[in-house]
């Protein structure tokens, strides 16, 4: 057997293994009152809502992957934000990954999105609604220059600034992750109204979408919130540190073994996955 065939078989075996992630075997939300459990990168959800696929204000991408589940607060946030955007005539909001029916760990692509409180939203607002084919295979619009130091001026639109600001001003939002170059542009454009910038955090990648995270719902007693972002607009030395070259001898951290699940999430898996 030649090397190409061996590599292909290994890839297929790897894909099959990834597809067998226990959380992906739960195909419907777990009945019960809505409860986000654990942390954003190690948790689950009971009583998730399904984001309605049909809406005049937003469109859901990659519906074949069935990642449009979340806490009712997340569904209401998406509906609230997209309605604001529509009322301002800014375009259609494009919704990416939320979470799986019971939350939990993905087979790749996300470390978080596990408690039904995270959503990815494309940083483009089409004036014409996308076709079904476009939604199934969406084309991301990379807003960041090749060197990663600034946004591409021709692609940066006032509507995108407004979209991020509207999301950050929402009472339920605790963090929004964007590329450092996008955060930098927001800092430049913000003027004197800057309180909302505290919630916008620079992070790796995130060149074409923002990752919005909500605070733990008050009645989700097993939900673990993150500490609040540091005071201030986050436009100073911390942001600039993202553009500095890595220090000599810096190596990528080793991949950590996932921590044990919260007991309630483990019990959920034990009950619902054969």
UniProtKB/Swiss-Prot annotation:
Tagged with keyword RNA-binding: no
Cofactor binding note from Swiss-Prot or TrEMBL: Binds 2 Zn(2+) ions per subunit. Zn(2+) ion 1 is bound in the active site. Zn(2+) ion 2 is bound at the dimer interface by residues from both subunits.
Biological process (GO), any one: peptidoglycan metabolic process
Cofactor: Zn(2+)
Compartment(s) of residence: Periplasm
Record keywords: Disulfide bond, Hydrolase, Metal-binding, Metalloprotease, Periplasm, Protease, Signal, Zinc
Disulfide bond entries: 44-265, 187-235, 216-223
Cited HAMAP family: MepA
Biological function: Murein endopeptidase that cleaves the D-alanyl-meso-2,6-diamino-pimelyl amide bond that connects peptidoglycan strands. Likely plays a role in the removal of murein from the sacculus.
Family: Belongs to the peptidase M74 family.
Name of this protein: Penicillin-insensitive murein endopeptidase
Species: Escherichia coli O1:K1 / APEC
């Amino acid at each position: 057997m030649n090397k190409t065939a061996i590599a292909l078989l290994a890839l297929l075996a790897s894909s099959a293994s990834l597809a067998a992630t226990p959380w992906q075997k739960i195909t419907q939300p777990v009945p019960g009152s809505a409860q986000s459990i654990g942390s954003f990168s190690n948790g689950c959800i009971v009583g998730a809502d399904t984001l309605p696929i049909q809406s005049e204000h937003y469109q859901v991408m990659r519906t074949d992957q069935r990642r449009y589940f979340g806490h009712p607060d997340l569904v209401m946030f998406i509906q609230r934000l997209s309605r604001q955007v529509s009322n301002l005539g800014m375009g259609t909001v494009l919704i990416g990954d939320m979470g799986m029916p019971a939350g939990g760990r993905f087979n790749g692509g996300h470390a978080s999105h596990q408690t039904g409180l995270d959503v990815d939203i494309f940083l483009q607002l089409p004036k014409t609604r996308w076709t079904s084919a476009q939604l199934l295979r969406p084309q991301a619009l990379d807003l960041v220059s090749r060197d990663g130091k600034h946004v591409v001026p021709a692609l940066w639109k006032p509507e995108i600034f407004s979209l991020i600001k509207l999301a950050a001003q929402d009472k339920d939002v605790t963090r929004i992750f964007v590329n450092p170059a996008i955060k930098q542009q927001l800092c430049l454009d913000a003027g004197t109204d800057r309180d909302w910038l505290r919630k916008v955090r620079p992070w790796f990648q995130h060149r074409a979408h923002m990752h919005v995270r909500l605070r733990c719902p008050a009645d989700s007693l097993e939900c673990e919130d993150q500490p609040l972002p540091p005071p201030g607009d986050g436009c100073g030395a911390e942001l600039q540190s993202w553009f500095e070259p890595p220090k000599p001898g810096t190596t990528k951290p080793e991949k950590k073994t996932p921590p044990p699940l919260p007991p309630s999430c483990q019990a959920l898996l034990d009950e619902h996955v054969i």
